[in-house]
């Protein structure tokens, strides 16, 4: 679980990067689709899956909106993300393994866009946070 130090580090990093969250989401989702082509199946209804396409940008923004929600619910991710968990489990039927894949892509993008802010400490705390988000989103799959 997240320590108070981890929570503070995530909130501090988020305060520095949140203005760029749309770009982070677009790049992370674009990377996931290219590097992990099996994830394309969830977006087969989109006419264009190329990096930066309108649908990819829009969903990247949605994903990062979910991350913003998670930051605001950092003290109780399970309860705070319950609606998103239900949506992904019952409506969208997303394999929860994909949450870890997208989390990794988000880490990669943040490390490249914000190398100064992405300290080793911030990396560890953000990785733990995104693991917690993935676990919370997987809650309704059980």
From Swiss-Prot:
PANTHER family (UniProt xref): HEMOGLOBIN FAMILY MEMBER, HEMOGLOBIN SUBUNIT ZETA
Please list the residues that bind heme b.
88
In Swiss-Prot or TrEMBL terms, this protein is called Hemoglobin subunit alpha 1
State what this protein does: Involved in oxygen transport from gills to the various peripheral tissues.
Family the UniProt entry places it in:
Belongs to the globin family.
Q: Which GO terms describe its molecular function?
A: haptoglobin binding; heme binding; iron ion binding; organic acid binding; oxygen binding; oxygen carrier activity; peroxidase activity
Query: What UniProt keywords apply to this chain's record, in alphabetical order?
Result: Acetylation, Heme, Iron, Metal-binding, Oxygen transport, Transport
Subunit info here reads:
Hb1 is a heterotetramer of two alpha-1 chains and two beta-1 chains. Hb2 is a heterotetramer of two alpha-2 chains and two beta-1 chains. HbC is a heterotetramer of two alpha-1 chains and two beta-2 chains.
Q: Name one GO biological process term.
A: hydrogen peroxide catabolic process
């Amino acid at each position: 679980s997240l320590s108070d130090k981890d929570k503070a580090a995530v909130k501090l990093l988020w305060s520095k990067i949140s203005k760029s969250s749309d770009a982070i989401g677009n790049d992370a989702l674009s990377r996931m689709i290219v590097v992990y082509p099996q994830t394309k199946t969830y977006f087969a209804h989109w006419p264009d899956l190329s990096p930066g396409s309108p649908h990819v940008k829009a969903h990247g923004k949605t994903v990062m909106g979910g991350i913003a929600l998670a930051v605001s619910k950092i003290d109780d991710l399970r309860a705070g993300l319950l609606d998103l968990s239900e949506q992904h489990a019952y409506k969208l039927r997303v394999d929860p393994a994909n949450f870890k894949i997208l989390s990794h892509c988000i880490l990669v993008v943040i490390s490249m866009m914000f190398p100064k802010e992405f300290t080793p400490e911030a990396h560890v705390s953000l990785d733990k946070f995104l693991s917690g988000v993935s676990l919370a989103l997987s809650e309704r799959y059980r």
